[in-house]
């Protein structure tokens, strides 16, 4: 039953008022939502209510969400860092274990090769140790090669109390130790003399003039005088002096030469003018040095004099040949001519064989170092003389 009020203004009961108040509340909320939607929407038509998102929550509790995200990231970083630390520790423990295993193997394995010498070691003892080790390994290696070549001989005639060494136990001389051995011996035994195993005659097969690094030079021997040359062209030119072969001839004057460069020098005389002329005879020359040599021939007294007969020569080569004739004549006179007093006093002495002291007394003293004074001797000019040019 519903209770009614006695007010004459309206006939509204209490239940009706409660229902009206509820309807008004709902209507106000709906009005607010509709009003907000109308403000934000572009069309005048009604739209469904706005779906709530995370933005209102962040607006209400902004500090709590940032702290939660920061703590989660920090925990992840800490877990990753701890995992890396554990992996590094495990790797370090594995390395230490491997090093310990290698050290144990090195201590257990026997030493295969001799210890290389140091600066403080005795050089003589080190050298002896290396040589003994090399000789022993060489003998074992040679014995093994013989066994491989003749296996049946060792099978029938081998003694049981001399077992053959196993091939795995043979340690031949390492190839890399040769260079090390040479370097060490050069440092410790630099002053020691080398031993020649081939004897004085060089029986080892290596030429005496050839070194370990230098290549021996080729030798070309002349078949006429056995003179040696290092180049075949020089031997060919030399042999033409024996055969007097002159394959290069001048087209103008017909003069022949042994060498092509001599012909080229000769053609230079024909092809060019002769600006240098002699003032005495009027002869022209291509070069000034040739004219200077020619002027010596016009001197009344040559610059080179013989110390025995005072004969003068224009060229030093002519003086040398003249002095040789004096020496031959003096030796013949001393051998043939003897004094009569010497022959009667010493009858048993041979007349044709004088003593060396007497021979030295009779021979004239020849001074070839200074044939004339420095003032009279002209300065030696570079190049060829006229006689040398004409003798080609």
UniProtKB/Swiss-Prot annotation:
Keyword hit for Iron-sulfur:
no
Q: Where are the zinc fingers (C2H2-type)?
A: 220-242, 248-270, 276-298, 304-326
* Polar residues bias locations: 336-356
- Output the Pfam families linked to this UniProt entry: zf-C2H2 (PF00096)
Q: Which domain of life is it from?
A: Eukaryota
Which Gene3D superfamilies does this entry report, sorted A to Z?
Classic Zinc Finger
**Reported tissue expression:** Has two temporally distinct modes of expression during early embryogenesis; expressed in seven stripes at the blastoderm stage, then during gastrulation the seven primary stripes are supplemented by secondary stripes which appear in alternate segments. This results in the labelling of every segment in the extended germ band. Also expressed in the embryo in distinct regions of the gut, the Garland cells associated with the proventriculus, the pericardial cells, the lymph glands associated with the heart, in a subset of cells in the central nervous system and in select apodemes.
The UniProt keyword set, sorted, is: Activator, Developmental protein, DNA-binding, Metal-binding, Nucleus, Pair-rule protein, Repeat, Repressor, Transcription, Transcription regulation, Zinc, Zinc-finger
Q: Which PROSITE patterns match?
A: ZINC_FINGER_C2H2_1 (PS00028), ZINC_FINGER_C2H2_2 (PS50157)
Q: Which GO terms describe its molecular function?
A: DNA binding; DNA-binding transcription factor activity; DNA-binding transcription factor activity, RNA polymerase II-specific; RNA polymerase II transcription regulatory region sequence-specific DNA binding; zinc ion binding
Region described as Disordered: 142-174, 320-356
- Coarsely, its chief localization is nucleus
Its Gene Ontology biological processes?
A: blastoderm segmentation; embryonic hindgut morphogenesis; embryonic pattern specification; imaginal disc-derived leg joint morphogenesis; Malpighian tubule morphogenesis; negative regulation of DNA-templated transcription; negative regulation of transcription by RNA polymerase II; pattern specification process
InterPro entries for this protein: C2H2-ZF_Transcription_Reg, Znf_C2H2_sf, Znf_C2H2_type
Q: Where in the cell is it found?
A: Nucleus
Protein family:
Belongs to the Odd C2H2-type zinc-finger protein family.
Q: What is this protein called?
A: Protein odd-skipped
**Which source organism?**
Drosophila melanogaster (Fruit fly)
């Amino acid at each position: 039953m519903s209770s009614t009020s006695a007010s004459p203004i309206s006939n509204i009961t209490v239940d009706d008022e409660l229902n009206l108040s509820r309807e008004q509340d709902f209507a106000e909320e709906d009005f607010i939502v509709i009003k907000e939607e109308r403000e934000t929407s572009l069309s005048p038509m009604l739209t469904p209510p706005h779906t709530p998102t995370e933005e209102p929550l962040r607006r209400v509790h902004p500090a709590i969400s940032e702290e939660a995200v920061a703590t989660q990231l920090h925990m992840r970083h800490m877990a990753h860092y701890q995992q890396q630390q554990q992996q590094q520790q495990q790797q370090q423990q594995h390395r230490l274990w491997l090093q310990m295993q290698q050290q144990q193997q090195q201590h257990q394995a026997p030493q295969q090769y001799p210890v290389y010498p140091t600066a403080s070691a005795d050089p003589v003892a080190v050298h002896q140790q290396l040589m003994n080790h090399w000789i022993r390994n060489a003998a074992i290696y040679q014995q093994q090669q013989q066994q491989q070549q003749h296996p049946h001989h060792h099978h029938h005639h081998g003694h049981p109390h001399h077992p053959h060494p196993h091939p795995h136990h043979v340690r031949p001389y390492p190839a890399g130790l040769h260079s090390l051995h040479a370097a060490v011996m050069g440092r410790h035994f630099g002053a020691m003399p080398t031993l020649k195993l081939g004897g004085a005659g060089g029986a080892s097969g290596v030429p005496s003039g050839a070194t370990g690094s230098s290549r021996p030079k080729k030798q070309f021997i002349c078949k006429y005088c056995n003179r040696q040359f290092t180049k075949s062209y020089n031997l060919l030119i030399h042999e033409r002096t024996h055969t007097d072969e002159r394959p290069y001839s001048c087209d103008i004057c017909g003069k022949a030469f042994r060498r092509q460069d001599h012909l080229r020098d000769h053609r230079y005389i024909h092809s060019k003018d002769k600006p240098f002329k002699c003032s005495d005879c009027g002869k022209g020359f291509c070069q000034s040095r040739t004219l200077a040599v020619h002027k010596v021939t016009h001197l009344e007294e040559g610059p080179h004099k013989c110390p025995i007969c005072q004969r003068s020569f224009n060229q030093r080569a002519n003086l040398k040949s003249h002095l040789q004739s004096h020496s031959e004549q003096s030796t013949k006179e001393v051998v043939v001519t003897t004094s009569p007093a010497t022959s009667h006093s010493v009858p048993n002495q041979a007349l044709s064989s004088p003593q060396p002291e007497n021979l030295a007394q009779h021979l004239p003293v020849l001074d070839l170092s200074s044939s004339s004074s420095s003032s009279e001797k002209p300065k030696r000019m570079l190049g060829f003389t006229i006689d040398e040019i004409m003798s080609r």
